[in-house]
UniProtKB/Swiss-Prot annotation:
The gene is nadA. This is Quinolinate synthase. Pfam families: NadA (PF02445). SUPFAM superfamilies: NadA-like. It comes from the Bacteria. It comes from Thermosynechococcus vestitus (strain NIES-2133 / IAM M-273 / BP-1). GO terms for cellular component: cytosol. One of its GO terms (molecular function) is quinolinate synthetase A activity. Pathway: Cofactor biosynthesis; NAD(+) biosynthesis; quinolinate from iminoaspartate: step 1/1. It catalyses: iminosuccinate + dihydroxyacetone phosphate = quinolinate + phosphate + 2 H2O + H(+). Belongs to the quinolinate synthase family. Type 2 subfamily. It is found in: Cytoplasm. The lineage of its organism: Bacteria, Bacillati, Cyanobacteriota, Cyanophyceae, Acaryochloridales.
Length: 319
C-alpha cells in the first residue's frame, strides 16, 4: 500500500503585492482590512476601516469576492450581509478574545434571566450571539444607538463590559452587562500611561472605549479607531499617546507625518507594544494564498445567517 503524496504547490511569486493585485482583478475581488492589520496588508487593501465602516463597505460592494483581512467575526458579518458572495479569510485561526468570552449557550442562559430586556450586542461577537440580539452596535455608534432606544426599555449590553460602562456613562442609561473583555485593551497599564505622560507632558492621550475605566480617566479623547484617527488629524497637538492596538498608528502617521504617535504599553515590562495576536495572524503571504486557492471560505447555515442579519440591518438603519 502506497501513501498518496500531496500535489506540489507552486512557489510563491517574488512580488506578492503585484500578484495580489492581479488576483483581485481576476476574481473581481475587494480587499477589506481593519486598522489593526499589519501595515503591509493595509497598503494593499481597497478599504481600511473600523467595524462600522467595514460593515458598510461589505453591505454595498459590487465585488464578487470579499477578502477580509481581519478576524473571524468580521468575515462572518460580511457573509451575513452577502450570502451569495465568496468571503475569504486569510487565516481561520484569526479569532477574537472578546467574541470567545461570550459563548452562545452561556449567553442564552444569561439572556433568559432577563426576559423583558432587549439585547444590544457589540459587533465583536459570533454569529450565534448576533442571532440572540435585538440590535448590533460598534464602538463608533454604540452611544448613538442606545440614545435612540426607548428610555424605559431595559437593556442587556454584551459582550464588552468596558464599552458597556462607557456607554452607560455617556447616556445615563443603566444596562445589564455581560462580563466580557478584549485581551489587548484590558492589559493597558494605568501606571505606564502615567509614566508616558510624565515623559511627554505636552502629549494628548487618546483611547479606545474598550479600555478599563482606570485607563480611560486619563484620556483627553475617547473614541472608536476611526474617531481616534480623525481626532489625531484635526487636533492642534504634535504628540499623541495612543491607547489601542498599534496597527492604527500606520494610518495616523501616513495622514500626519509631522506628528509623533506613541503606542501605549501593556502592564508587561518586557514589551512596549500591545499587538492583537489574532489580527496579526494574517500576513501578506496568507492573503495571497487565500485568493489563489479561494479558501478558507466563510460559510454559515442559512437559518443562523437570517437570524443574525436582522440586528445588523437595524444597526445600519439607525446609523
Amino acid at each position: 500500500m502506497f501513501a498518496t503524496l500531496a500535489a506540489p504547490q507552486p512557489p510563491l511569486p517574488l512580488d506578492l503585492v503585484a500578484a495580489i493585485q492581479d488576483l483581485k482583478r481576476e476574481l473581481n475581488a475587494v480587499i477589506l482590512a481593519h486598522y489593526y492589520q499589519d501595515p503591509a496588508i493595509q497598503d494593499v487593501a481597497d478599504y481600511i476601516g473600523d467595524s462600522l465602516g467595514l460593515s458598510r463597505q461589505a453591505a454595498s460592494t459590487n465585488a464578487d469576492v470579499i477578502v477580509f483581512a481581519g478576524v473571524h467575526f468580521m468575515a462572518e458579518t460580511a457573509k451575513i450581509l452577502n450570502p451569495d458572495k465568496l468571503v475569504l479569510l486569510p487565516d481561520l485561526a484569526a479569532g477574537c478574545s472578546l467574541a470567545d468570552s461570550c459563548p452562545a449557550d452561556a449567553f442564552a442562559a444569561f439572556k433568559a434571566q432577563y426576559p423583558d430586556h432587549w439585547v444590544i450586542s457589540y459587533i465583536n461577537c459570533s454569529a450565534e450571539i448576533k442571532a440572540l440580539s435585538d440590535i448590533i452596535c460598534t464602538s463608533s455608534n454604540a452611544v448613538k444607538i442606545v440614545q435612540q432606544l426607548p428610555p424605559d426599555q431595559p437593556l442587556i449590553f454584551a459582550p464588552d463590559r468596558n464599552l458597556g460602562r462607557y456607554v452607560m456613562a455617556q447616556t445615563g442609561r443603566q444596562m445589564v452587562l455581560w462580563e466580557g473583555s478584549c485581551i489587548v485593551h484590558e492589559t493597558f497599564s494605568e501606571r505606564r500611561i502615567l509614566e508616558l505622560k510624565a515623559t511627554y507632558p505636552n502629549a494628548q492621550v487618546i483611547a479606545h472605549p474598550e479600555c478599563e475605566e482606570a485607563v480611560l480617566r486619563h484620556a483627553n479623547f475617547i473614541g472608536s479607531t476611526t474617531a481616534l484617527l480623525n481626532y489625531s488629524q484635526t487636533e492642534d497637538c504634535d504628540t499623541f499617546i495612543v491607547v489601542t492596538e498599534p496597527g492604527i498608528l500606520h494610518q495616523m502617521q501616513r495622514r500626519n507625518p509631522q506628528k509623533t504617535f506613541i503606542p501605549a504599553p501593556p502592564q508587561d515590562q518586557t514589551c512596549n507594544c500591545n499587538e492583537c495576536p489574532f489580527m496579526r495572524l494574517n500576513t501578506l503571504e496568507k492573503l495571497y494564498l487565500c485568493m489563489r486557492d479561494r479558501k478558507p471560505q466563510i460559510e454559515l447555515p442559512e437559518d443562523l445567517r437570517l437570524a443574525a442579519l436582522k440586528p445588523i440591518q437595524r444597526m445600519l438603519e439607525m446609523s
